């Protein structure tokens, strides 16, 4: 390359002097004072080690390969692809050089490791074979493209593709031989680039070549696997090589930085474009940007004593910037100082660049940011601003110099010329030293003229200063460069995909940060802060504002949540995203598989030519890191949305049915059918009337199939608690909703309950006649949101889940149509990827954040007489509980086999054994209870009680009846159990006995069922429940309970009382007529209890006969001290004894 050909903007009168301003490697002796300047130059030339060679073949080649690759990304068109192969083969297999050997030699030099000769020769031979076959394939592809219907060209291109693909699969391992992975890495990366480009052709042209769809899919999946494999290999061994060169001295850092710079150019830059070879993700020409920075060598001669120079860590920590948003150089403000020469006869004084600060802008922003000072301004003699505003600096020429003293040297840069596309800028401390340091030796252009073919632009300048009292002084500027593709404007095009790296943001949230990238992304990553806002990007829309775009975001995280895209502060896109990895570390440690894409199904249109795009997160499942790599804009045609809706609906409808459309697929739920129906409803009837009508008919047919396989009656909840249909039975607290954003049909709304004994519930029993023996059935449904919702399916035992589901399906502001109705078409994007039951989490028996749910139940043998059936129950037993759910169904899933069959047989046997035991137990209780009840009644018709039957005896019979188990189902106390008929029979007789008891008792409310009603009491008397009975409680000696009762005079009565005394003293019941005739029953705590007369421990029944002389009598209950409990007071005519 002719370095004097600087393009039209450069100074054609300047002649570049190739003499080197290098010092000797040793401190010069005092004899310097006797030298003249020409003698000094003679010594420096004689003792200077060989300089970095100009025109590095390996680097020159890879920057051209990268340029060619960037221009052919995505699917740029057939001519671009053939020209790409033609250019690449010319670059990598030129006639007069072995470029692959140059690649190996370059890395061998950097890491000082030679490849074993056999491995080297084998790799070179195989590369030669690949080059020959690639040329043949390129010609065959071009011939076929020119004659696509010619069978001969088709056969030839297929043969050449398969041969070349097989060679790549066979030879790639030779480019990663164990022990030589690093020196072979450039070869590996460049070969991988070609293999991925080849595999792209299979997806693009495979159907036209006659490949089967399976063959195309196999090749495509292999390509995706290789993208990941090749990317990870490149990064792994790049990092390994870099860590191998870690050191402690300045010279070691120089080599370390050269390895980093050259391997970025030769390996990582090309690895960054591997994903874009995926022709399904990148289906058109694609524009991407390499935002990584590379650093050219410090502008300095070799320091004579490396031990006194800047240390490795100082260079890395000071010269190398921390990760940051991409910025663009606007101005350098440079200070100049002077080193006085030891002798002007030997050399002139050195006016040198001593300090500077940098002003820069961020992408598409007018704000100017200025750094602090690099260096120390003390002692400077002049300063000035050097503006580069809007001028890409693609090349620098510098004059690194040294002033030599007998025992020390002072290093500095006398002048630098900055060559830009709009002209050049010259910093000149003086003009006595020659421009010998050329940046294009390290960052060459992709051809000539340089101002058109440059590959990098200057973006920043750092500096290292090192001085000690007795040794070398040095102020060393260090330039950093970005790739030319990382342009200032984020241009969005009408005809190609635009991939904007996240580090092109101009503003981040205060807690969001830029972190080091993993190496294969072409730059660094943005890591979210603690809140939802991430940052803002400015874009330039180079297309009509009517143009529509799809959007996707490349990200890595171990959290799930909602990703929002705002345009000009208005919400444009929202979508739920899932974690891409289970655990995640720092950005630099991520692998290719750590990343995924958030793809939005709806399109956007930009409101103006320079929109602000904001990235935002919501509803994160935890605080783990979230990394953003890039956001992509894919142009689509004006009817893309409607076409996508049609294709999406067609695909969705087809996936509902089994082959032949005779039945629904097993995995298809009733909710899914409804959602597909909504997709069909959203199809444009104007653009696709026939297709929409056909799909509507199919989805209606699918809904009928869904109803027909559903074993539940009334799946639309039209007849809850109906006396005409044996379907759903429910409690209060249930509302039937209809037609919202989530549900197309009816759905249930459950509220919480104030009493756990009376939950909000809904249940249904599926009749035995609907079931098959030894079969599995599934209860399925969909929950919009819920808390403490319990779902049961019951046969031999209960399968139970508590369902807590977050209300995270829809945004806070819901889209509505012009009539104020739910706009389901607009809301569909939020429901496209609902979490399924397989993605839910289970903790402490609670199924969380699963909108779709499913519970299994298996049948054993079928017995229509027993009619065990399957019970389905939903309930909420807490005040805080709520639920909104629907699309309930129970469907047959198939026969149970193997372990499941054995398990259900064991369950049935266990259930039958339990049932037999229960039957025996119940029969024994029934016999006892029947006998006890028979003893209460005077006749078989249960129309009269025996006169001597006491309250305690009735209560004792009731206790026996209440000991019967399985009267109601354990999971819901209102559903009759297996012993409910027996219990109902016996309980009816108990109730009849109490009714007859109350009828013959002339003392109303004698069992205190109505509390203190009809009694006159003092304030300290109360009634409390004890063992199913209401008991009158007197706690103090002055407590008093009174009652007046009207009787027949001159008739005999029996006063019978069941009571209990606690503590000292006595309790009493006194009966007195108006003439003062009195009688009394007394109770004490020390009385002997007649077991036959005792119902509950401590309670005693006593009676007396009373013959009133007046119509009215007075009853008084009291005590002398302690506590007195009265269960029942009965007063009845003695004639009842007859």
From Swiss-Prot:
GO terms for molecular function: signaling receptor binding; toxin activity. Keywords: Sporulation, Toxin, Virulence. GO terms for biological process: sporulation resulting in formation of a cellular spore; symbiont-mediated killing of host cell. The keyword Transcription does not apply. The keyword DNA damage does not apply. Pfam families: Cry1Ac_D5, Cry1Ac_dom-VII, Endotoxin_C, Endotoxin_M, Endotoxin_N. Toxic segment of the protein is located in the N-terminus. PANTHER family: ENDOTOXIN_N DOMAIN-CONTAINING PROTEIN-RELATED (PTHR37003), PESTICIDAL CRYSTAL PROTEIN N-TERMINAL DOMAIN-CONTAINING PROTEIN (PTHR37003:SF2). Promotes colloidosmotic lysis by binding to the midgut epithelial cells of Coleoptera. Belongs to the delta endotoxin family. This is Pesticidal crystal protein Cry7Ab. It comes from Bacillus thuringiensis subsp. dakota. The lineage of its organism: Bacteria, Bacillati, Bacillota, Bacilli, Bacillales.
């Amino acid at each position: 390359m002719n370095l004097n050909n600087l393009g039209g903007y450069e100074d054609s009168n300047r002649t570049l002097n190739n003499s080197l301003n290098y010092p000797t490697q040793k401190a010069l002796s005092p004899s310097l004072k006797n030298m003249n300047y020409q003698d000094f130059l003679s010594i420096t030339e004689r003792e200077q080690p060989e300089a970095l060679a100009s025109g590095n073949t390996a680097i020159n080649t890879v920057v051209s390969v990268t340029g060619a690759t960037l221009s052919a990304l995505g699917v740029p068109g057939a001519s671009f692809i053939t020209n790409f192969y033609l250019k690449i083969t010319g670059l990598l297999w030129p006639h007069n050089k072995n470029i692959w050997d140059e690649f190996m030699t370059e890395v061998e030099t950097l890491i000082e490791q030679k490849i074993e000769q056999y491995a080297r020769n084998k790799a070179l031979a195989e590369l030669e074979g690949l080059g020959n076959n690639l040329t043949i394939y390129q010609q065959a592809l071009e011939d076929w493209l020119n004659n696509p219907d010619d069978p001969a060209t088709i056969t030839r291109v297929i043969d050449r593709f398969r041969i070349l693909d097989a060679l790549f699969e066979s030879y790639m391992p030779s480019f990663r031989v164990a022990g030589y992975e690093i020196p072979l890495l450039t070869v590996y990366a460049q070969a991988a680039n070609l293999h991925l480009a080849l595999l792209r052709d299979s997806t693009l042209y495979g159907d036209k070549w006659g490949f089967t769809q399976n063959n195309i899919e196999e090749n495509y999946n292999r390509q995706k696997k290789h993208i990941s494999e090749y990317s990870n290999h490149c990064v792994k061994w790049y990092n390994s090589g870099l860590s191998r060169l870690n050191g402690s001295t300045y010279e070691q850092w120089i080599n370390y930085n050269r390895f980093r710079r050259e391997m970025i150019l030769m390996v990582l830059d090309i690895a960054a474009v591997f994903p874009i070879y995926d022709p399904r993700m990148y289906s058109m020409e694609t524009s991407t940007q390499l935002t990584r920075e590379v650093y050219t060598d410090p502008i300095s001669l070799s320091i004579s004593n490396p031990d006194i120079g800047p240390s490795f860590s100082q260079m890395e920590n000071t010269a190398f910037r921390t990760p940051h948003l991409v910025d663009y150089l606007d101005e350098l403000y440079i200070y100049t100082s002077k080193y006085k020469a030891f002798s002007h006869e030997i050399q002139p004084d050195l006016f040198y660049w001593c300090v500077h600060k940098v002003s820069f802008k961020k992408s598409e922003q007018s704000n100017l940011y200025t750094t602090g000072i690099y260096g120390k301004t003390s002692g400077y003699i002049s300063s000035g601003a050097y503006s580069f505003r809007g001028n890409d600096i693609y090349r620098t020429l510098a004059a690194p110099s040294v002033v030599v003293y007998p025992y020390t040297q002072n290093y500095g840069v006398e002048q630098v010329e900055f060559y830009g596309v709009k002209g050049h800028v010259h910093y000149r401390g003086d003009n006595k030293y020659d421009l010998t340091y050329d940046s294009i030796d390290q960052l060459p252009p992709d051809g000539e003229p340089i101002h058109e073919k440059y590959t990098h632009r200057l973006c920043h300048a750092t500096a290292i200063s090192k001085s000690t009292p007795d040794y070398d002084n040095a102020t060393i500027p260090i330039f950093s460069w970005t790739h030319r593709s990382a342009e200032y404007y984020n241009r969005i095009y009408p005809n190609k995909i635009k991939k904007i790296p996240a580090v092109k943001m101009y503003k981040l949230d205060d807690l969001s940060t830029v972190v080091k990238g993993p190496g294969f992304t072409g730059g660094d990553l943005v890591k979210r802060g603690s809140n939802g806002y991430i940052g803002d990007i400015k874009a330039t829309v180079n297309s009509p504002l009517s143009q529509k775009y799809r959007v996707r975001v490349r990200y890595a995280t171990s959290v799930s949540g909602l990703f929002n895209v705002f345009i000009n502060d208005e919400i444009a896109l929202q979508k739920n995203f899932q974690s891409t990895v289970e655990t995640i570390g720092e950005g630099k440690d991520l692998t290719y598989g750590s990343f995924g894409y958030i793809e939005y199904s709806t399109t956007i249109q930009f409101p103006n030519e320079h929109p602000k795009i904001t990235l935002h997160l919501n509803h994160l499942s935890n605080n783990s890191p979230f990394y953003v790599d890039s956001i992509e804009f894919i142009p689509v045609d004006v009817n893309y949305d409607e076409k996508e809706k049609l294709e999406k609906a067609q695909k969705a409808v087809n996936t509902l049915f089994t082959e032949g459309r005779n039945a629904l697929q097993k995995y298809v739920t009733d909710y899914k059918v409804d959602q597909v129906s909504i997709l069909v409803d959203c199809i444009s009837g104007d653009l696709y009337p026939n297709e929409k009508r056909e799909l509507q008919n199919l989805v209606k047919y699918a809904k009928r199939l869904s109803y027909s396989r559903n074993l539940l009656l009334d799946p639309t909840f039209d007849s809850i608690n109906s006396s005409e249909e044996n379907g759903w039975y429910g409690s209060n607290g249930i509302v039937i909703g209809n037609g919202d954003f989530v549900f197309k049909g009816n759905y249930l709304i459950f509220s919480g309950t104030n009493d756990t004994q009376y939950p909000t519930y809904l249940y249904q029993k599926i009749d035995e006649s609907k079931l098959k023996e030894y079969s599995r059935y599934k209860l399925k449904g969909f929950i919009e949101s819920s808390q403490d919702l319990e779902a049961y399916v019951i046969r031999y035992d209960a399968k139970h889940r508590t369902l807590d589901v977050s209300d995270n399906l829809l945004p806070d502001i819901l889209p509505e149509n012009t009539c104020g109705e739910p706009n389901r078409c607009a809301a569909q994007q939020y429901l496209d990827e609902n979490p399924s039951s397989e993605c839910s989490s289970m903790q402490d028996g609670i199924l969380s954040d699963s909108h779709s749910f499913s519970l299994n139940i298996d049948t054993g043998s079928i017995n229509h007489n027993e009619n065990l059936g399957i019970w389905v129950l939903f309930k909420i037993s807490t005040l805080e509980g709520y639920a909104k759910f629907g699309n309930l169904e129970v469907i047959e899933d198939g026969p149970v086999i193997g372990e499941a069959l054995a398990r259900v047989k064991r369950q049935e046997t266990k259930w039958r054994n339990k049932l037999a035991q229960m039957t025996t137990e119940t029969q024994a209780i029934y016999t006892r209870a029947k006998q006890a009840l028979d003893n209460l009644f005077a006749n078989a018709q249960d129309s009269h009680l025996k006169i001597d039957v006491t309250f305690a005896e009735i209560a004792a019979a009731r206790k026996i009846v209440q000991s019967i188990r399985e009267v109601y189902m354990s999971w819901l106390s209102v559903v009759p159990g297996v012993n409910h008929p027996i219990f109902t029979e016996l309980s009816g007789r108990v109730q009849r006995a109490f009714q007859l008891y109350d009828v013959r008792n002339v003392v109303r409310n004698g069992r205190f069922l109505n509390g203190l009603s009809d009694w006159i009491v003092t304030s300290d008397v109360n009634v409390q429940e004890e063992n199913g009975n209401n008991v009158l409680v007197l706690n103090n000696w002055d407590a008093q309970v009174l009652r007046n009762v009207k009787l027949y005079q001159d008739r005999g009565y029996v006063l019978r009382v069941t009571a209990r005394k606690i503590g000292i003293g006595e309790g009493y019941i006194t009966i007195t007529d108006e003439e003062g005739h009195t009688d009394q029953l007394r109770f004490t705590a020390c009385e002997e209890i007649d077991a036959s007369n005792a119902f509950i421990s401590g309670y005693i029944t006593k009676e007396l006969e009373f013959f009133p002389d007046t119509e009215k009598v007075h009853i008084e209950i009291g005590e002398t001290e302690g506590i007195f409990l009265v269960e029942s007071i009965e007063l009845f005519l003695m004639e009842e004894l007859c």
